[in-house]
Regions:
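Sequence-structural signature of mature extracellular/luminal beta-sheet repeat domains
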Residues: 1-168
């Protein structure tokens, strides 16, 4: 599992990336690649009172979640999450930003593709959703018009409507 957040119902919502393998690069352990024991990406709900675990999302519009990474709830009770995807020998999934409800009834892909959608967070006023794009070292900010809806394009191919915040 990667990111976790407490939902409005007091349960913990987990971004489970399904597992990956570790690489030792000059003594530094780096996560990467889909492991042999990969179990599929998913969003899980953990009831802290009973200990029960329920899988609430495994796909969006027929596309499987590959590596859910980080999650944040908004004041409306829904949540935003990123999916980093998985890397393979000579190819890599594109990442994405999603919006969903904790009841398991609504999930929407909001931005695709994102090279390596990692961290996600809301501005204090919850009018901007921030996405850390790790590989290129960038932080993107998208104006929110309503829960699960941003202003501007859904692709990084066109930059109007989104704010490039930082390049490392």
């Amino acid at each position: 599992p990667n990111g976790a957040a407490i939902g409005p119902d007091g349960c913990v919502y987990i971004c489970n990336n399904g597992g990956f393998e570790w690489h030792n690069i000059d003594g530094l352990l780096i996560p990467g690649g889909q492991g042999d024991n990969y179990s599929g990406g998913r969003i899980e709900k953990v009831d802290l009172k009973t200990g029960s675990i329920e899988t609430i999302y495994t796909e969006c519009d027929g596309n499987p979640l590959k590596g859910p990474n980080d999650i944040v709830f908004d004041k409306e009770g829904g949540f935003w999450f990123t999916d980093l995807g998985k890397s393979y020998n000579r190819q890599k999934d594109q990442g994405a930003l999603f919006y969903a409800t904790p009841d398991g009834k609504f999930i929407k892909e909001v931005v695709f593709p994102i090279e390596s959608a990692n961290g996600v967070g809301l501005s204090p006023e919850e009018d901007i959703i921030y996405v850390a794009d790790t590989t290129p070292g960038r932080l993107w900010g998208y104006p929110i018009t309503e829960p699960g809806v941003i202003r501007g394009p859904k692709s990084f191919g066109v930059h109007s409507g989104m704010h490039f915040i930082l390049s490392l």
